[in-house]
From Swiss-Prot:
Function description: This protein binds to the 23S rRNA, and is important in its secondary structure. It is located near the subunit interface in the base of the L7/L12 stalk, and near the tRNA binding site of the peptidyltransferase center.
Family to which this protein belongs: Belongs to the universal ribosomal protein uL6 family.
Pfam families: Ribosomal_L6
GO cellular component, as recorded: cytosolic large ribosomal subunit
A Gene Ontology biological process term: cytoplasmic translation
Keywords annotated in UniProt: Ribonucleoprotein, Ribosomal protein, RNA-binding, rRNA-binding
PANTHER family per UniProt: 60S/50S RIBOSOMAL PROTEIN L6/L9, LARGE RIBOSOMAL SUBUNIT PROTEIN UL6M
Assembly and interaction partners: Part of the 50S ribosomal subunit.
Alphabetized GO MF terms: rRNA binding; structural constituent of ribosome
Coiled coil start-end: none
Signal peptide start and end residues: none
Name of the featured protein: Large ribosomal subunit protein uL6
PROSITE patterns, per the entry: RIBOSOMAL_L6_1
Lineage of the species this protein comes from: Bacteria, Pseudomonadati, Pseudomonadota, Gammaproteobacteria, Vibrionales
Organism per entry: Vibrio vulnificus (strain YJ016)
Length: 177
């Protein structure tokens, strides 16, 4: 039985939730998100709360209910507060700049890298070695951050590359003769 699914999701003031079968739409100040929930989950809306439960006769329904509750909670937090992800570039000559709807990266390749940002994601560069991604969709921000990091993941000897701000890169010792 899922402890996560048992807790209801509170709907704050200014957030509008629409249930249409298994599709849930959350609209708030920062934007609008929509998601289709698994058929094994029963969603009920009571005033300013959403409750999740399992459908009878489905094997992993409690697990799916917990997952659905976490996803919907992230949607509610996203449209009220939003999410941010910070990336740090470490290395000689590694730079980032915003170019329209893309992030321009200089990462030691023979060519500059342009990463196009999807709709709903905003990027800013407080300095040449920092990228801050903001948006209301937690999953999309994480995916964009992972895509940017994949251009130059931090290497374990000198730590050069693109890392998350909260990431701790374990370093290795150099080979000894």
């Amino acid at each position: 039985m899922s402890r996560v699914a048992k807790a209801p999701v509170a709907i704050p003031a200014g957030v509008e939730v629409k249930l249409n079968g298994q599709e849930i739409t959350v609209k708030g100040a920062k934007g609008e998100l929509s998601r289709v929930i698994n058929n094994a989950v029963v969603i009920a809306q009571e005033e300013n709360k959403l409750t999740f439960g399992p459908r009878e006769g489905v094997a992993n329904a409690w697990a799916q209910a917990g997952t659905a509750r976490a996803l919907v909670n992230n949607m509610v937090v996203g449209v009220t507060e939003g999410f941010t992800r910070k990336l740090i570039l470490k290395g000689v000559g590694y730079r980032a700049a915003i170019k329209g709807n893309a992030v321009g990266l200089t990462l030691g390749f023979s060519h500059p890298v342009e990463h196009e940002l999807p709709a709903g994601i905003k990027a800013e560069c407080p300095s040449q070695t920092e990228i801050v991604l903001t948006g209301c969709d937690k999953q999309l921000i994480g995916q964009v951050a992972a895509d940017i990091r994949a251009y130059r993941a931090p290497e374990p000897y000198k730590g050069k590359g693109i890392r998350y701000a909260d990431e701790n890169v374990r370093s290795k010792e150099a080979k000894k003769k």
